[in-house]
Amino acid sequence: MSFSGEHPGNANNEGPPPPPPPPPPPSHSSAPPSSQGGSARAAPLNGAFHSHQPHSQGYARAEGSNGYRQPYGRGGYRGSGGRYYGGYGYGHGGGGYGYGHGGGGNYGHGHHGYYGYQGEYRGHSGYQRFNSPAPVGTRYSGAAGPAARPPPPPEPEPEQPFELTDDPLFHLTELDRSTDDPRQLDEMRRIFKDSVQLDQKLEQQKLAMWRTELELSLLDTQSAKDALNVQLNQENLDALLMQG
């Protein structure tokens, strides 16, 4: 049911329209300041642009030398350093983003670390560093530091080199590993050395005995020859005596 003075199009009034989205970021080339949106302009001061426009419902529109009008902002924006002075707003300047609120604070110079976000906040009292805690379940996906190297394996103990004077059986029978007492090892080495020396002397005695046996056999042969010669000479003498 509608009254006669009511406009039919206002029956379904859903409130004021939402604010328009911000325009795309402008290029880095400088453009002359716009003359729309108020009677006051932003005056450059060391790369900073401060707005002097009248406020409308607590908000104002600021613009800088890059031709970009900052929506829903109160105060000024420093484009070269990513700083925003004044009320709530968002802007993009020549080389950096800026966001801020309050009397003279800025938010920027941040970089991501291993966990959370690190940056600097400068208010009236100067620069203050802050580290925001990482949310629960946050995991840094960047390149991790170098992994710790595992400890090297223990080097094997060098084997004891064989002495040239040792008997091979002393190592083949692993008697050198049977004990760690150096005295016992020296005693076993001495026994093996004596055994080797005795074997060598025994071989020498055997060689001498074989030499003697050979000489004896030669003497026996010579003795047999001499006996035959004596017998032959005796027969020759007997034959001469019978002829005479």
Curated annotation (Swiss-Prot):
InterPro entries: Tscrpt_reg_Lge1. It is found in: Nucleus. Residues 15-27 have a biased composition (Pro residues). It comes from Eremothecium gossypii (strain ATCC 10895 / CBS 109.51 / FGSC 9923 / NRRL Y-1056). This is Transcriptional regulatory protein LGE1. Involved in transcriptional activation. Also required for ubiquitination of histone H2B to form H2BK123ub1. H2BK123ub1 gives a specific tag for epigenetic transcriptional activation, telomeric silencing, and is also a prerequisite for H3K4me and H3K79me formation. Its precise role in H2BK123ub1 formation however is unclear. GO terms for cellular component: nucleus. Residues 28-44 have a biased composition (Low complexity). Transmembrane segments: none annotated. Keywords: Activator, Chromatin regulator, Coiled coil, Nucleus, Transcription, Transcription regulation. The keyword Secreted does not apply. Residues 1-81, 132-164 are annotated as: Disordered. It holds the Pfam family Lge1. CDD domains: Lge1 (cd22897). One of its GO terms (biological process) is chromatin organization. It comes from the Eukaryota.
